[in-house]
């Protein structure tokens, strides 16, 4: 990290003042902690909503992008919450409507590899508000009422910013050729809930891999086997 900041010409500034940070921003990336409580079985998301409230009070036209790990359905629930909140507020002058501009773009950072994984991302995923089936009509109606204009375009612009800041990947794999225009970084756009689910299912799959190989190690110990030899042999299967 020190080498990167020392050698790269970067236009960065830092502040602890949220008002000055948000007032002229086109995009506000929210990466607040959302600690999971296994006893209560929920994510503590109040830090995210604290940031959202401040952004809306300072720069309501900014597009907010949540990066934090959140439960599936959380972003759409925020559209419902703020649609209800907006109806109780004083109308804006000249008949203008209050807008809520929220996207979700999960991060896939490994421990101690955050800078590398930002420069060489495995994929970029951006979720934006899309209409769902009739059973989700309350959410759909809230989105219709308050979503900002051109949210899909806002998602595409944000992805371009991430690509611009990345170093990019190599095109050794012919499958990656389709992503040539995005520096060979797979870039996907989808609904908010789908993007939230991608993050959680990826985490779950990685946890299952760890659990599986822990079981393998336990079995090898009981049977007097060399676990590393087994893992090496299993891992050579291209499907694994």
Give the positions of each predicted feature:
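Structural/interface elements that position substrates and couple domains in central-metabolism enzymes
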Residues: 1-240
């Amino acid at each position: 990290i020190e080498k990167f900041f020392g050698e790269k010409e970067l236009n960065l500034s830092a502040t602890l003042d949220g008002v000055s940070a948000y007032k002229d921003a086109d995009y506000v990336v929210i990466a607040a902690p959302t600690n999971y409580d296994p006893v209560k079985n929920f994510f503590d998301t109040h830090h995210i909503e604290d940031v959202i409230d401040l952004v809306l009070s300072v720069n309501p036209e900014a597009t907010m992008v949540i990066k934090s790990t959140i439960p599936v359905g959380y972003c759409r629930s925020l559209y419902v919450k703020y649609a209800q909140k907006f109806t109780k507020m004083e109308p804006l002058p000249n008949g203008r409507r209050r807008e809520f501009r929220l996207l979700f773009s999960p991060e896939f950072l490994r421990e101690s590899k955050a800078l590398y994984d930002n420069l060489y991302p495995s994929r970029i995923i951006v979720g934006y508000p899309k209409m769902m089936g009739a059973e989700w009509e309350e959410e759909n109606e809230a989105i219709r009422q308050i979503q900002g204009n051109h949210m899909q375009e806002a998602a595409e612009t944000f992805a371009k910013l991430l690509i611009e800041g990345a170093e990019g990947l190599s095109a050794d794999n012919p499958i990656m050729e389709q992503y040539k225009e995005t520096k060979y970084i797979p870039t996907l756009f989808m609904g908010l809930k789908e993007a939230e689910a991608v993050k959680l299912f990826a985490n779950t799959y990685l946890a299952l891999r760890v659990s599986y190989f822990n079981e393998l190690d336990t079995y090898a110990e009981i049977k007097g086997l060399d676990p590393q030899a087994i893992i090496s042999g299993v891992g050579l299967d291209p499907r694994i």
